[in-house]
């Protein structure tokens, strides 16, 4: 017995413009699509329920192709600093925070909104009795107070390879940590099986409410023993209908493989070895070929020495793994592309270029010759556009987030959020991809790089499943595919500009069953 969904604009995303009015779902699969009358007659004895979609629009359910699920769940339970405009008020809020441990944590501050970069002295003025950490929105920079420095064992002469410790005018540590220096924080703030499971449940509930039913995630380094984190996934995905694809951080890959922990489970599997080549534009740690426009003495940070980076790629190949690399600056992309050319992926597989934020024509031409996935976050463009002009200048900024050029190379373009760094709201990702404007309103940046709405939607639906080899039954709304879909009040294909951001999600459905409902649409 099944459910007949009728009176909808049901977009298959199998090809542009293909839309059906009704579909019959049974045992979690789409049995048939077409006109309501025909389906009523064909399945007359098997229709248990009829759902009237009331003219709403239906799309395949979304997959976030770049997220940190455990970290996102943690952030939902911590002080949200993303909208903070006054540092002292933020710290006073943090001072009242209750926690299971003694660290006081705030997530996602933006020094541009605060009007200043926090330092340990500023934090000490409000909270000096407990260790405090403020994580910048990019999560490549964090600030701790004096207690935090003490807890991390950081002293004046400490040197961090692949990272940096901020200093004041007198050369003393000012509490600002960059890139690899944050690894010490991860160890201090690490979770366990129970805590990580709670974070996962919190994250998945939130994702369902955004139409997201699957994710490509990277969590195994930051939250304690990677084997316990894998156990947390087993606990949660044994009870929640969510599909996860786990990348494996290079610092834990040996342990995970030695314990034979990468066996595919029903609702999650494992992918490439993840590594970082550089940092972020916001922290001026993305690796550039020319200096930052607003800091001529800075070109960014190499997280790994070139010989170490090469050794990591060789290690992945020894393990028979693909490589997924965080590369934002053009110099970082060039380093990684050179290594992929030197150590090609196994035939029939693809490496993953994460972010690929700043690309000249030469790099795009080289990428065209490689079997790669482009792991893109269109929301970054709209979040950061004003800052990008500051960091890169008026000319170089036109080479950022070249989505259309990358798609035209034949590379598989994936849409994601990098939450908790940016919002999981897919509407924001679609807006960034098709409008290429700031959320605050601006002219279009390099309009030739805009995606069509069809291309943008596919990057969040079908393409993520192609990347993981699960596209035979997922990512489209066609006969025999899993009945995973979202129902929206308005039609994304008719919306322009900011109207995209205001479309309302009515329902998220997994295997034919609602997992989120904003309103009852059953008649």
Question: What residue spans do the PLM features occupy?
Answer:
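A cytosolic small-molecule/anion-sensing beta-strand core signal
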Residues: 6, 26-27, 277, 481, ...
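Short alpha-helical functional segments enriched in proximate histidine and acidic residues
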Residues: 97, 206, 466-467, 515
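Acidic (Asp/Glu)-rich catalytic clusters
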Residues: 237, 260-268, 367-369
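Non-cysteine beta-strand/loop elements that form the S-adenosyl-L-methionine
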Residues: 268-285, 372-382
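His/Asp/Glu-enriched, well-ordered alpha-helical/loop segment
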Residues: 314-324, 331-351, 356, 361-365, ...
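Glycine- and charge-enriched low-complexity intrinsically disordered segments
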Residues: 517-523
């Amino acid at each position: 017995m099944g459910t007949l969904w009728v009176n909808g604009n049901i977009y298959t995303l199998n090809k542009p413009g293909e839309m059906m009015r009704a579909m019959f779902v049974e045992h979690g699969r789409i049995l048939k699509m077409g006109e309501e009358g025909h389906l009523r007659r064909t399945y007359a004895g098997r229709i248990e329920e009829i759902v009237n979609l009331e003219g709403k629009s239906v799309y395949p359910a979304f997959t976030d192709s770049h997220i940190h699920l455990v970290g996102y769940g943690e952030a939902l339970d911590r002080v949200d600093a993303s909208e903070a405009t006054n540092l002292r008020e933020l710290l006073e809020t943090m001072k009242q925070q209750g926690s299971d441990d003694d660290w006081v944590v705030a997530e996602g501050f933006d020094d541009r909104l605060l009007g200043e970069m926090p330092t340990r002295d500023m934090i000490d003025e409000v909270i000096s009795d407990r260790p405090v950490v403020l994580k910048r929105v990019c999560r490549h920079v964090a600030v701790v107070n004096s207690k935090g420095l003490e807890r991390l064992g950081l002293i004046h002469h400490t040197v961090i390879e692949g990272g940096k410790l901020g200093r004041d005018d007198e050369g003393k540590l000012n509490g600002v940590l960059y890139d690899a220096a944050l690894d010490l924080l991860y160890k201090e703030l690490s979770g366990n099986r129970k805590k990580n499971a709670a974070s996962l449940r919190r994250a998945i509930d939130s994702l369902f409410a955004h139409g997201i039913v699957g994710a490509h995630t990277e969590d195994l380094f930051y939250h304690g023993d990677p084997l316990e984190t894998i156990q947390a996934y087993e606990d949660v995905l044994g009870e929640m209908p969510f599909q996860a694809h786990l990348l494996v951080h290079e610092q834990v890959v040996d342990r995970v493989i030695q314990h034979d922990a990468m066996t595919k489970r029903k609702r999650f599997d494992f992918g490439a070895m993840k590594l970082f080549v550089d940092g972020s534009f916001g922290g001026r740690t993305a690796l550039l070929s020319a200096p930052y426009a607003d800091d001529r003495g800075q070109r960014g940070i190499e997280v790994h020495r070139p010989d170490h980076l090469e050794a990591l790629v060789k290690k992945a190949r020894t393990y028979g793994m693909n490589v997924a690399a965080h590369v934002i600056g053009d110099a970082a992309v060039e380093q990684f592309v050179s290594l992929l050319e030197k150590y090609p992926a196994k035939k029939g597989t693809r490496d993953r270029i994460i972010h690929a934020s700043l690309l000249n024509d030469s790099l795009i031409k080289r990428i065209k010759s490689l079997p790669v996935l482009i792991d893109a976050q269109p929301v970054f463009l709209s979040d950061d556009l004003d800052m990008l002009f500051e960091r890169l200048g008026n000319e170089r900024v036109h080479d950022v987030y070249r989505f259309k050029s990358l798609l035209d190379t034949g590379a598989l373009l994936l849409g994601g959020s990098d939450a908790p760094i940016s919002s999981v709201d897919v509407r924001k990702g679609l807006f960034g991809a098709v409008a290429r404007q700031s959320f605050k309103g601006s002219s279009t940046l390099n309009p030739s790089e805009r995606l069509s709405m069809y291309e943008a939607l596919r990057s969040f639906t079908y393409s993520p499943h192609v990347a993981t080899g699960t596209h035979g039954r997922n990512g489209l709304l066609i006969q025999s595919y899993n009945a995973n879909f979202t129902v929206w009040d308005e039609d994304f294909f008719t919306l322009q500009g900011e109207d995209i951001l205001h479309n309302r999600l009515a329902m998220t459905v997994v295997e034919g069953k609602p997992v989120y409902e904003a309103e009852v649409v059953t008649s």
